[in-house]
Amino acid sequence: MEEGLLRHENDRDDRRITACVILSTFVAVCSSFSYGCANGYTSGAETAIMKELDLSMAQFSAFGSFLNLGGAVGALFSGQLAVILGRRRTLWACDLFCIFGWLSIAFAKNVLWLDLGRISLGIGVGLTSYVVPVYIAEITPKHVRGAFSASTLLLQNSGISLIYFFGTVINWRVLAVIGALPCFIPVIGIYFIPESPRWLAKIGSVKEVENSLHRLRGKDADVSDEAAEIQVMTKMLEEDSKSSFCDMFQKKYRRTLVVGIGLMLIQQLSGASGITYYSNAIFRKAGFSERLGSMIFGVFVIPKALVGLILVDRWGRRPLLLASAVGMSIGSLLIGVSFTLQEMNLFPEFIPVFVFINILVYFGFFAIGIGGLPWIIMSEIFPINIKVSAGSIVALTSWTTGWFVSYGFNFMFEWSAQGTFYIFAMVGGLSLLFIWMLVPETKGQSLEELQASLTGTT
């Protein structure tokens, strides 16, 4: 009976949400706010930058896509840096790249400094996209892990909202300085938050694992069971594998790798990067006011992200991903139909509003699932021994595919507005099958329980 009571007390400690967990999450997700600002920046600043620096459409498309190119570089080294430096110091490095990138854009006198800043910003957000969800997943109690991890998407959307709302009325250089400001919070804040206990276990700092857990769960919490579970699972995985790059291709990890890469391909090939970067071009083509569209969109993006944050630990990951795929596919299809009707000169008075409404539909469903859950699931499904290599490959997939979409979007859109969105709708339909057949539910399980079930480790 005493053993049962102790287990109950330990479970209660594991579920505790402390001020330290909240502070640590806040410090980490400030980087995601800058990520959101970077995503929305090209849409709001497009006209002013092209006019002041005399850029062609090809040059501006390249500038927009360099965020993804830099992101691919950051993603390639993100996992290794997170192991060598730890999660906290990697967060610090992310923000140094972002600060340099934003300031380079803000003071750019020519396209070279503009592009250099965008690439540096990309490297920073590429590191961010890996280390922030991993750090949050490793420090939070399992029953709220999804909601806390989803806060990254909330902050990203807050950054997008800020840029969309003010981008058409604030000078593009001032806008870049505003984008840099949140990056200073993690630069200072990392000195006040604990390191990930799972990273500490991996490097063999047994005493520090318990110290970190005590800060996260409370000084009076009994963290012995959680610390033991982390250390046993980490040791088991390390003994089972020498942690080489090729380990992730073992049969037992095949499903997790396919799921991680597949979700990132879905996220990018559904067109989100292109639509976010160049939404003003879509409004212009549809005949809808760019300023009004940007401001309404800016107000809309935050509540839609809140919905996903509230539902992720109630409904689970799979239902939200499935609903997201259906909604995005329908939204893309209806935008394509709108541009088809426009080309046929049918219902011209309704086309602008219809396109705008369906862009909101698309992004509403994007936000509750495919927008952020692939990163959350990536941070959950890979065991510590392959998290570096597999996580880096998955992040690299996202950024390289995002570069392809963001660079090619303007050219595709000029070729055929409706054809572009029909392609995105088709991707949404295929993603529904992929999610239904392969993606596991991760809600309510500890990372160790989840990874054991996926790999068959006992």
Curated annotation (Swiss-Prot):
The lineage of its organism: Eukaryota, Viridiplantae, Streptophyta, Embryophyta, Tracheophyta. Its main location: membrane. GO terms for molecular function: sugar transmembrane transporter activity. Belongs to the major facilitator superfamily. Sugar transporter (TC 2.A.1.1) family. Sugar transporter. Keywords: Membrane, Sugar transport, Transmembrane, Transmembrane helix, Transport. One of its GO terms (cellular component) is membrane. InterPro entries: MFS_dom, MFS_ERD6/Tret1-like, MFS_sugar_transport-like, MFS_trans_sf, MFS_Trehalose_Transporter, Sugar/inositol_transpt, Sugar_transporter_CS. Signal peptide: none annotated. It is found in: Membrane. Coiled coil: none annotated. PROSITE patterns: MFS, SUGAR_TRANSPORT_1. The chain crosses the membrane at residues 17-37, 66-86, 96-116, 119-139, 150-170, 174-194, 257-277, 292-312, 319-339, 350-370, 393-413, 419-439. This is Sugar transporter ERD6-like 10. It comes from Arabidopsis thaliana. It is a multi-pass membrane protein.
